[in-house]
Swiss-Prot record:
The keyword ATP-binding applies. Belongs to the choline/ethanolamine kinase family. This is Choline kinase B1. GO terms for molecular function: ATP binding; choline kinase activity; ethanolamine kinase activity. It holds the Pfam family Choline_kinase. InterPro entries: Kinase-like_dom_sf. The keyword Transferase applies.
Length: 371
């Protein structure tokens, strides 16, 4: 734990120590009226919902600029990527302004907004709006490696799991009843799953690589109070990947609900997994927005939409394999965010094997040109 995270973990938001620290940040990075602010004029409010960060809204009764203080909990590589992406999107008007960054955190513009939740993300109109906002982010050229990252991240996660002493993994689903999965999976077999999913992806979708969010759950989408515009936030997993992986990641996560405070802290809906209600509308909105952005008149819009639906369905189980590999290691690390990581990993593995045959069929159909 970094010293700054330890400081904000051990001291209450209304403590003198925290008040003095946020005034110091205000003076250092914003200047202006913060130089004259007194401690009794400052309010620090904890913002709930961040698993990767501690977040605080800092305001004063004066004209000093309010700000959002973000204290990182992630490792250096995630923090670096998130900060780079945040700065780029800030400069291009696609996110909050960056006020400053320091070892272990940053200060940014506070956008009066609501965070979408697991219920509203299922609203057909909101789902269409999310689909329509994606293309402008996918069109950005970000100065990082253009190599697709998702499969390498899976391998890195498995290696970390093994380095922590992890071995063969039992799969006993808790919130889903799918039964296509093996009862136990070896690390060698998991690496093989990753390898052939990567092989299929290389053969079919190598020309669809764009810059992706890779973690667009509802909690990472803001709706601005002033304009109702949707803004994508929290880019620590941002990297280049196939666009279908990014879109399927969002769609698959609409079936996962993390709001239950009782164990295991996650519920995956089989109904929303097997019959996603907004897949058609979401893909229509994406295709229309993408064509508009590129000033392109589609020769066959229906075919474009159908192909994108097929693309999303292909990657759907791959997103579950991605998160299952990632959270296995968190379980060994006793990562505490209110979610049982072993339950999450096992349920996601069950979803992966349940949907794997559909992906195999899509692969075979696309190779034959019949999908």
């Amino acid at each position: 734990m970094r010293p700054i995270e330890k400081f904000f973990t051990e001291n209450a938001p209304d403590s003198d120590l925290v008040i003095e620290k946020v005034i110091e940040f205000g003076i250092d990075f914003l200047g202006g009226e913060w130089k004259n602010v007194k401690k009794n004029e400052v309010k620090v409010t904890t913002i709930l919902g961040g698993q990767s960060n501690h977040m605080f809204h800092v305001t004063s009764s004066t004209s000093a600029t309010p700000y959002l203080l973000r204290i990182h909990r992630q490792g250096p590589s995630h923090v670096f990527m998130d900060t780079v992406n945040f700065a780029i999107f800030s400069e291009r008007g696609l996110g909050p302004k960056l006020y400053g960054f320091f070892d272990g955190g940053r200060m940014e513009e506070f956008l009066p907004s609501r965070t979408l939740d697991s219920d509203c993300i299922l609203d057909p109109e909101i789902s269409r709006r999310v689909g329509a906002v994606y293309p402008k982010y996918h069109a950005i050229d970000v100065p990082v490696s253009k190599k697709r990252r998702c499969f390498q991240v899976m391998r890195e996660s498995l290696k970390e799991y093994q380095d922590l002493g992890g071995g063969d993994y039992e799969i006993k689903p808790t919130t889903v009843t799918y039964s296509e999965h093996p009862k136990k999976i070896s690390m060698d077999d998991l690496y093989k799953e990753i390898d052939f999913m990567e092989k299929w992806t290389n053969e079919l979708f190598e020309d669809t690589v764009v810059f992706c969010h890779n973690d667009l759950a509802s909690s990472n989408i803001l709706e601005l109070n002033s304009t109702k515009e949707l803004v994508l936030i929290d880019w620590e997993f941002g990297s280049y990947n196939c666009r279908g992986f990014d879109l399927a990641m969002h769609l698959a996560e609409t079936a996962a609900d993390f709001r239950d405070s009782t164990p295991p802290g996650i519920r995956i809906s089989e109904e929303l997994t097997d019959n996603p209600p907004n897949l058609q509308g979401f893909c229509e909105a994406y295709v229309d927005a993408d064509n508009k952005l590129k000033n392109r008149v589609p020769s066959n819009r229906d075919l474009e939409v159908s192909n994108l639906i097929c693309e999303c369905q292909f990657f759907w189980p791959i997103t579950q394999l991605f998160w299952a590999c990632f959270v296995m290691k968190l379980a060994l690390l006793k990562y505490n965010c209110g979610v049982d990581m072993d339950v999450q990993a096992q349920d996601r593995f069950a979803v992966y094997w349940h949907l794997k045959e559909r992906t195999r069929k899509i692969y075979e159909d696309l190779k034959k040109g019949t999908c």
